Swiss-Prot record:
A GO term from the CC aspect: extracellular space
Protein name: Transcobalamin-1
Keyword Secreted carried by entry: yes
Organism, as annotated: Sus scrofa
Region (Flexible linker): 309-327
């Protein structure tokens, strides 16, 4: 069972919607470069990076211009070895897109792997499979719109095949797949903004042919998505950092610029406040670092150099931290495992579930898969999360004044607003 969606980390990054000439306010100032050591050190923790999941780390290192040849070589080899062992059908479209971005970044020799294994062509086929599934299953993709946006962005950057009509049809900002936890998903919207921006540029540059109405439609989608992101009070997850380039090019009033500059300053302060927790995860550090150095995924195909100021790093231990749980959406089916008087984290809770399963697999049976963000429950008591039905299992925790804390897992459904 494939992961139905990437669980967001709520509210850990703000970004600024300001014109291009003032974009540097979104970026960490040179005097604060020393604070990036924690993020870079987190990405050096190879024990937490397995196989293809190293693509995020490799991409981040290259976009940020971090000079660590031995780490790049190790990550590249791990990814290639993992892919050679895998059946391509076991890769989601988004995973393949991320691998292409990582290998294609900064025009390194790894680009040969993309060509030799026809990865862009295979991504095009996977994108078609996503569209086909949407046509059959009430507009639900095999994965999610976050990955679908990565697909379009990657196909656009690497001149792959995709249909403009599919883009204009399925990337309407009012599509239900842009919603998560009862709200518009700014993470997904931000990736879509970059994907649509790349497509718009390709049309303007004559790289792909499209009708004027299609170009106008895409521009309206971009503007609508940006408006929706602004309406969510600028609170976004780690992934949203890649929308910075497009959003920084918007024409806004002086009053708005001043307000956004203030928000940008809070961005870095808030980042440092949370750095002792979630940013110690390699995947989290990888997603935020390039933006803090002024880079985005739209820079992937450029030949990038090292930052103006070298970021010296120190080796320090990076402990494993549990994944944060998303907000409750709507509960379809609930399994209550136990009642306890003290608070325990999700890792301990899963250990309890494993022990219970050994005692009675009928009542407490469950399956899970490991991801860079932590364990992901795929089924409980034979009831599976289902992409086509937009359902997934999540950890729940409730406590009443007169009762001990109750912990469990529930099958929830992603809903449109």
């Amino acid at each position: 069972m494939r992961q139905s969606h990437q669980l967001p980390l709520v509210g850990l990054l703000l970004f600024s919607l300001i014109p291009s000439q003032l974009c540097q306010s979104c970026v960490v100032s040179e005097k604060d470069y020393s604070h990036l050591r924690l993020l870079i050190s987190a990405m050096d923790n190879l024990e937490q990076i397995r196989g293809i999941y190293g693509a995020s780390i490799l991409l981040s290192q290259r976009l940020a211009g971090i000079q660590n040849p031995s780490l790049e070589e190790e990550l590249s080899q791990r990814i290639q070895d993992d892919m050679n062992r895998r059946d391509m059908s076991n890769l989601t479209s988004g995973q393949l897109a991320l691998i292409i971005l990582a290998f294609g970044a900064c025009k390194t020799p790894d680009v040969r792997f993309i060509h030799d294994h026809h990865l862009v062509e295979k991504l095009g086929e996977k994108f078609k499979e996503e569209i086909k599934n949407m046509e059959i299953h009430n507009s639900n993709p095999l994965t999610n719109y976050y990955q679908l946006s990565f697909d379009v962005l990657t196909l656009c950057l690497f001149r792959g095949n995709y249909s403009i009509s599919n883009v204009t049809h399925y990337f309407n900002p009012e599509n239900k797949n842009f919603n998560l936890s009862g709200h518009f998903s700014v993470d997904t919207g931000a990736v879509a903004v970059l994907a649509l921006t790349c497509v718009k540029r390709s049309i303007s540059n004559g790289k792909i042919k499209a009708a004027i109405k299609d170009s106008d439609t895409i521009q309206k989608y971009i503007e609508s998505l940006v408006h929706k992101i602004q309406s969510e009070k600028m609170v976004v997850s780690l992934e949203t950092r890649i929308a910075q380039e497009k959003l920084c090019r918007l024409s806004l009033s002086h009053q708005t610029i001043t307000k956004m500059n203030q928000i940008a300053k809070k961005l870095w302060t808030r980042c440092l406040t949370h750095s002792q927790g979630v940013f110690r995860l390699p995947i989290a550090a990888a997603q935020i670092l390039p933006a803090l150095l002024g880079k985005t995924y739209l820079d992937v195909t450029k030949l990038l150099l090292v930052p103006k100021v070298q970021v010296n790093i120190t080796d320090e231990p990076v402990p494993v931290v549990p994944t944060l749980s998303p907000e409750n959406i709507s509960v379809i089916y609930c399994v209550k495992i136990n009642e306890i008087s003290n608070c325990i984290n999700i890792t301990v809770f899963l250990d309890v579930m494993k022990a219970a399963q050994e005692k009675n697999s009928t009542i407490y049976g469950f399956t899970m898969t490991e991801t860079p963000w932590g364990p992901y429950i795929t089924s409980v008591q034979g009831i599976w999360a289902n992409n086509n039905e937009r359902t997934y299992w999540e950890h729940s925790e409730q406590q009443q004044i007169t009762k001990p804390r109750s912990m469990g897992i529930m099958l929830s459904k992603m809903e449109s607003i």
